[in-house]
């Protein structure tokens, strides 16, 4: 065997193979991908440089995610899984082999996407980043316990420590050792006094006065008493240590580990063998890390089980309009809607109450006096009323103690076995802070432990900025420093990573369910930096979402730091700054869907600008750009939010212009979502759409009479099952089925519209239930989905497919792209109009029957936009969008801007929360919230046209938008 040659073992899926080969001297420089065909990829070949910061870009739907997540990440994960035993694999869930010929030089892959945010109410920023675990350890090791009742410091000492402290008193000090046997308890306590006398003790201290046990002692049984047995009297001098130790042990036995030393000058020293308060008698268990976990019974508040809140039925949701009478349907909660029917049992109960307490059911609910209101809501307090009810067995009179609406509905909620009924009841509930822990989630004894004068909840409720200051200024004793040094080092490092990714406004106590996709992703990014792994391929999905331009530099510095550690970074991104900062940009396209899946260009941002085929390059170079409107439209009216103070909003008044497009801007965490989503949308939804929502804290909204409905167009899926698709969501499928049912063939066979649905029996293939595929469980291998062998994936039975419209079956039509269908249905105006809007929003490439589960968030949002555009507007609608540019390329943003202006042209109002400067510069009006995130935000910094905001010296948004105008 030659010098450069060696034999080495290669691990393959089939077992070990002995390969004779040459060991390469240099390390593999690239991740080499050959023949990638996942989703719309067209046998793509690409060499991605390793240990570099690589950006994948291209139009929405071009195949970026198919290459990054479905090919590179999936194969990296699969190879790791393959190295495990089949026993271990069955617990991990399997990954299918991606449709690719080969991938070489692939490092272990870690995906940080937006979808896998934990929605568990127990999950917080602190628990996800594991910083909270370090804080639990810190508090358990160096925390100072306090009595939760009186606030005094609680400490515990051994007998030797107690003796040493007493011996340290000035010599000749007269002391008496007291055993506190009764603390703050009512009663005569004859047995206690008798027992003390029998044990040979002579004196007791009762309520601060000294008594001889030989005298008659009578106590008032209705008063609380404190009784201490005087065990010994001593004068402090060197030779008393032996006697003192014996006496101290006696006291501790008598008083369950407590000792009070009374110096004759009136001072008292309290000692405890365990963590207990000598004054209040409250004792604490051993302090451990689990004492500070709200997910563990040892630490969690017993009342709310550590959630910090309770779901409780809300009177305002059960009776939304109090100007209506009960007879006219004021009570809308489940089970009581029937009380408008005079023959119902609920009405019979209310009639009986009205007769007993002399009130009318025809009176508007808001006019009832407090007594009647409380009877209806909270019950009759056990008092019965005579209910006359005509049932199936005739008329009966029943004695009923009315429990009140809230108790009644709570009982029904507990007793129902139906999940859907439970969900319906939950729409009448609101989240209220737990009365026992006031939202702090832990037991009082755990909240009594402090470090730097703050308990663990107070520390985790500080913003990351303030937490960093707290950690820097923390003053600890020498012993505390010695114990906590390593823990503090870990906490400081992890907290600084969160600040580095622009999350300095968040708190560790913030629930992860309330985080945006971008925030959740950046938190996981910070956690990964903390882990310090090297030689890994990190695959990220638009980490810049929700990040203001001001904080972009921080994020880019973090990404470069990950790269510099020795990792490969693959970032799916549309942000211009990120592309310019990358070592390499991979442009996939040229179009979307069928027209994408090819490698258009690869190289630096400068290389892309020179490439005539790259649309991305043309936008980067400025050859293509989104134009600034020549004039800004004038508002047709105003909507005024008064006294907004949800979360960090500082009791502000905000004017929203009507009939135009408004952008609400500001740095991350400034209060944009609190203002628009929590207050504006929820209040309008409640008042205009009659939705059961509770708006955020505010005084009022003036001008709602100018609107007739509010629509929130978000990026949530258009359906949760593969049975929903763009055709069903937009209403196209109904019209297409009408067309098929109207054909001569369908009429001759007697087929109605329902025959052409794959959701009901009749026309669908029954072998697969209209799914077109069958799932085969493989236990420790991944489940295999195979096309149905009866219909061959077409979802319908043979007879249905024989009915043709213009030579195409219903399956053929569902398989068409929007572009193909547009040409096919040109003669049918109602269908053509809906297809045209789908085409206009940039979805020419999606298939009409494409399962909604395969659509991205951006695609789902644009389908919703298309559905809105195709409706005939009233000119009184307000549309609310939260970061609609997520997942959109420059070219897609161009289309989106045109759509948003089309929506507002008919007199409708569009309110957009956005960081994308191309959208902001085209807005008619900007409301800039800030100036900072968290506590430093919550005020209106600037408002007006983009030109006016650009002149503001205090607006960060103005500074950046000025360059785009």
Language-model-detected regions and their locations in the chain:
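Conserved phosphate-binding elements of NTP-dependent enzyme cores
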Residues: 2-965
């Amino acid at each position: 065997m030659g010098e450069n040659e060696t034999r080495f073992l290669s691990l393959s899926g089939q077992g070990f193979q002995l390969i004779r080969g040459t060991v390469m001297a240099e390390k593999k420089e690239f991740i080499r991908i050959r023949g990638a065909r996942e989703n719309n990829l067209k046998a793509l070949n690409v060499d991605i440089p390793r240990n570099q910061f690589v950006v994948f870009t291209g139009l929405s739907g071009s195949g970026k995610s198919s290459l990054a997540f479905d090919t590179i990440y999936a194969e990296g994960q699969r190879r790791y899984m393959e190295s495990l035993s089949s026993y271990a694999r069955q617990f991990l869930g399997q990954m299918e082999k991606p449709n690719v010929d080969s991938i070489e030089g692939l490092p272990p892959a870690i995906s940080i996407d937006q979808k896998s945010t934990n929605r568990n109410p127990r999950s917080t920023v602190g628990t996800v980043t594991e910083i909270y675990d370090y804080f639990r350890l810190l508090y358990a090791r160096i925390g100072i316990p306090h009595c939760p009742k009186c606030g005094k410091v609680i400490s515990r000492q051994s007998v030797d420590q107690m003796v040493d402290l007493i011996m340290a008193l000035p010599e000749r000090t007269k002391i008496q050792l007291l055993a506190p046997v009764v603390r703050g308890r009512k009663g005569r306590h004859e047995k206690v006094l008798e027992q003390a006398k029998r044990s040979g003790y002579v004196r007791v201290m009762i309520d601060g006065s000294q008594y001889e046990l030989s005298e008659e002692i009578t106590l008032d049984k209705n008063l609380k008493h404190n009784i201490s047995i005087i065990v010994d009297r001593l004068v402090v001098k060197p030779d008393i240590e032996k006697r003192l130790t014996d006496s101290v042990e006696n006291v501790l036995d008598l008083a369950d580990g407590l000792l009070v030393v009374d110096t004759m000058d009136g001072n008292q020293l309290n000692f405890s063998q365990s963590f207990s308060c000598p004054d209040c008698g409250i004792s604490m268990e051993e302090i451990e890390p689990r004492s500070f976990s709200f997910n563990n019974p040892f630490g969690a508040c017993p009342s709310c089980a550590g959630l910090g809140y309770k779901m409780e039925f809300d009177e305002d949701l059960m009776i939304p309009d109090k100007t209506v009478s009960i007879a006219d349907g004021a009570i809308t909660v489940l089970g009581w809607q029937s009380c408008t029917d005079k023959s119902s049992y609920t009405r019979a109960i209310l009639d009986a109450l009205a007769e007993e307490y002399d009130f009318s059911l025809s009176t508007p609910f808001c006019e009832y006096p407090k007594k009647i209101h409380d009877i209806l809501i909270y019950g009759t307090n056990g008092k019965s009323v005579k209910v006359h009810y005509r049932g199936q067995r005739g008329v009966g009179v029943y004695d009923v103690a009315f429990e009140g609406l809230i108790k009644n509905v709570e009982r029904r909620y507990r007793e129902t076995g139906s999940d859907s009924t439970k969900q319906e009841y939950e729409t009448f509930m609101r989240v209220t802070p737990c009365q026992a822990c006031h939202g702090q989630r832990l037991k009082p004894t755990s909240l009594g432990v402090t470090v730097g004068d703050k308990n663990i909840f107070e520390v985790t409720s500080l913003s990351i900025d303030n937490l960093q200051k707290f950690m820097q200024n923390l003053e600890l004793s020498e012993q505390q420093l010695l114990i906590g040094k390593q823990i503090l080092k870990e906490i400081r490092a992890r907290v600084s990573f969160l600040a580095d990714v622009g999350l300095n406004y968040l708190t560790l106590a913030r629930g992860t369910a309330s985080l945006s996709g971008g925030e959740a992703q950046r938190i996981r990014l910070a956690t990964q930096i903390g882990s310090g792994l090297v030689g890994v391929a990190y695959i990220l999905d638009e980490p810049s979402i929700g990040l203001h331009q001001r904080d972009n530099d921080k994020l880019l510095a973090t990404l470069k730091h990950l790269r510099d550690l020795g990792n490969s970074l693959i970032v799916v991104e549309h942000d211009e700054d990120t592309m310019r900062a990358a070592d390499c940009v991979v442009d996939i396209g040229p179009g979307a869907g069928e027209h994408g899946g090819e490698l258009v260009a690869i190289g630096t941002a400068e290389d892309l600008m020179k490439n005539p085929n790259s649309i991305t390059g043309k936008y980067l170079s400025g050859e293509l750009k989104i134009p600034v409107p020549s004039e800004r439209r004038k508002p047709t009216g105003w909507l005024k939010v008064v006294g907004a103070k949800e979360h960090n909003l500082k009791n502000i008044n905000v004017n929203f212009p009507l009939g135009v497009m408004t952008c609400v801007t500001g740095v991350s965490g400034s209060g944009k979502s609190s203002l628009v989503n929590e207050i504006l949308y929820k209040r309008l939804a409640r008042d205009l759409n009659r939705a059961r929502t509770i708006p955020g804290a505010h005084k009022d909204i003036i001008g709602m009479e100018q609107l007739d409905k509010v629509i929130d167009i978000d990026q949530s899926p258009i359906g949760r099952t593969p049975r929903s698709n763009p055709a069903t969501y937009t209403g196209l499928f109904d019209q297409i089925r009408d067309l098929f049912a109207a054909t001569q063939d369908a009429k001759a066979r007697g087929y109605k519209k329902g025959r052409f649905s794959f959701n009901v029996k009749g026309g669908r293939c029954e072998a697969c239930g209209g799914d077109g595929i069958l799932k085969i469980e493989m236990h420790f291998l991944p489940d295999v989905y195979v096309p149905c062998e009866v219909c061959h994936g077409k979802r319908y039975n043979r007879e249905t497919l024989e009915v043709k419209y213009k030579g195409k079956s219903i399956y053929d039509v569902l398989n068409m792209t929007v572009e193909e269908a547009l040409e096919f249905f040109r003669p049918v105006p109602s269908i053509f109009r809906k297809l045209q809007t789908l085409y206009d929003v940039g979805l020419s490439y999606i298939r009409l029957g494409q399962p909604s589960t395969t659509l991205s968030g951006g695609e789902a949002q644009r389908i919703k936009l298309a559905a809105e555009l195709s409706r005939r507007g009233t000119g009184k609608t307000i549309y609310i969008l939260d970061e609609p540019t997520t997942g959109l390329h420059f070219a897609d943003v161009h289309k989106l801007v045109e759509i948003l202006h089309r929506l507002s042209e008919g007199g409708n109002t569009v309110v957009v929360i956005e960081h994308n400067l191309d959208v902001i510069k085209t807005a008619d009006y900007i409301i800039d919230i800030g100036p900072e995130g968290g506590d430093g935000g919550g005020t209106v910094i600037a408002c007006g046209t983009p030109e006016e905001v650009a002149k503001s010296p205090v607006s960060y948004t103005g500074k950046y938008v000025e360059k785009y105008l």
